[in-house]
Amino acid sequence: MHLALFGAALSLVASAAASSFPHPHSNHVRTASGQATTEETIPGYFSGSCTKDKMTIRKEWRHLSKVQQTDFLDAVQCLMDKPAKSGLTATTSRFSDLQALHRGMTNTVYADIIHHVGQFLPWHRYYMHIYETILRDECSYTGFIPYWNEVKDADSGDMWGSSMWGADAFGGNGTGSGNCVQDGRFANYTLHIGPGDEDTDYCLQRAFDSEEAIANANSTALKMCNSYNTYSPWSDCISNIPHKGVHTYIGGVMSDIKSSPGDPVFFMHHMYVDRMWWLWQKQDPANRLYDISGPTVNETANVEPAGGWQNATLHYELSSFSIMPNTTIGKVMNPQGGYLCYGYDSE
């Protein structure tokens, strides 16, 4: 059973982004096929304190050694065991602080300000940075958050074939009438935030739908999204097809637009979404690295103000209810711009 499912497509509202942030040089590398490489050694992106030597390379789950996989799962469990600090409603652990943060951003005075808005991708990039920072600072984690290469599994026809769904990792599908996950490192994990805006005790739920997940996450769907050359239509497509599709068809907790970070797989999924954005940005960095547009409030849940919708710009402030200091969209647009310092492997 799906919970509060991810919403309909957002409007294609575009605006010119401010240009006061540093832009990359144009000497990026291309392969013979014309596609930008996924290696993160391309000159021109690094700025501020980020250098090639300092940069973290995020890897696909299957590229981690068994020790690295265990270290990551141990760090996630550490957050689940640590007491909450945020003071947000219904929090019981540091991990639940992050779930409550995500839900809180869907319940502002302007309703949901992190989905169906221009800042959808920048805010979630910031959110991944918060998660990674807390894992390191509070659980002594020295690695990175891995991602799940969803298109690889969708194209193979076996959406749930990755070892990440194994009994020694995140566990697999839910079972029984409640779709509770009963294997893996987080078997029988109890959530207290959600479903939706409720605060109840319930199990970690999944309800896989392989056919629909494959249709939304395969290379045909991704190719369609990548046919868009500007941020708003590309972001809309990614948000509503591979992003929303995988959330919905993992089902259970992941299909709850408000409280989906209660499933640790959420962060693997959003690392992949972030990787898709970064690869798209690098295809044409002169035009895409700082390309931002779209409304800052969810038009489906608000009445248009007399002055029209405010569009996202590089100066728009991203907030986390003081879990980490606020930053701006401009600071997170370039993963190697100094505020952030990471790349992705070349799978």
PLM segments and residue spans:
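Fungal secretory targeting signals
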Residues: 1-31
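Intrinsically disordered, flexible peripheral segments
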Residues: 19-347
